[in-house]
């Protein structure tokens, strides 16, 4: 920002797949410094690496850790060995809380394709819930059922496997958008051909 002489208010952070963890970390760091970006867009994001890997399937077909689900203690042991957790959900809870406390500005957009075979689209639900918990200021006191009902009320369906959920509070907006098809090659670029649809 200083080198290019561009204010944060004119910068949008964009992260895709593993890059969403980096964008989340950058947003959290600068939020703690009192700096708000024009927006943050996370495409195919995930709540944390251990959570995502617990449901990860190669090409959408080969569930890497499925055999370990029969022994939850073993799955927990394997996942506990992950050094870098990339806990984006925790980061967004804290970032939203920090921005809210100082009456700052937040624009977070979560974009995912239902047929993304690398990162399950449900991972965005965790990011959305975490950011909302940071905004409402009750942290973990917002129970799942209440949050789900409130999210449903703020959601517009765009057909099968497609919706937009928007949470607005003062100058803070968290938006989650699900598309039925796209995966990573086509969701962001419009290019690439992804022929396998689930």
Please state what every model-predicted region is.
Residues 1-9:
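Conserved acidic catalytic loop of the alpha/beta-hydrolase fold
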Residues 15-19, 23:
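Gly/Ala-rich beta-loop-alpha elbow adjacent to hydrolase catalytic centers
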Residues 17, 44-46, 114:
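Residue-level signal for short, function-critical loop segments
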Residues 25-97, 126:
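Hydrolase active-site cap/lid region
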Residues 102-104, 109-112, 116:
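Short beta-strand/loop motif that positions the catalytic acidic residue
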């Amino acid at each position: 920002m200083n080198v290019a002489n561009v204010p944060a208010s004119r910068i949008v952070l964009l992260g895709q797949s593993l890059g969403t963890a980096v964008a989340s970390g950058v947003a959290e760091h600068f939020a703690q410094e009192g700096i708000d970006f024009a927006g943050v867009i996370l495409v195919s994001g995930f709540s944390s690496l251990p959570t995502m890997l617990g449901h990860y399937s190669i090409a959408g077909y080969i569930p890497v850790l499925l055999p370990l689900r029969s022994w939850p203690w073993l799955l927990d042991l394997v996942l506990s060995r992950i050094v870098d957790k990339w806990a984006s959900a925790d980061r967004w809870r804290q970032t939203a809380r920090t921005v809210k406390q100082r009456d700052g500005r937040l624009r977070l957009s979560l974009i995912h394709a239902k047929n993304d075979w690398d990162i399950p689209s449900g991972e965005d639900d965790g990011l959305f819930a975490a950011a909302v918990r940071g905004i409402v200021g009750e942290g973990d006191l917002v129970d799942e059922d209440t949050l789900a009902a409130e999210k449903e009320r703020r959601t517009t369906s765009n057909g099968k496997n497609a919706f937009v959920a928007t949470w607005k509070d003062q100058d803070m907006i968290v938006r989650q958008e699900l598309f039925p098809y796209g995966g990573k090659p086509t969701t962001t670029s419009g290019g690439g051909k992804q022929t396998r649809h689930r």
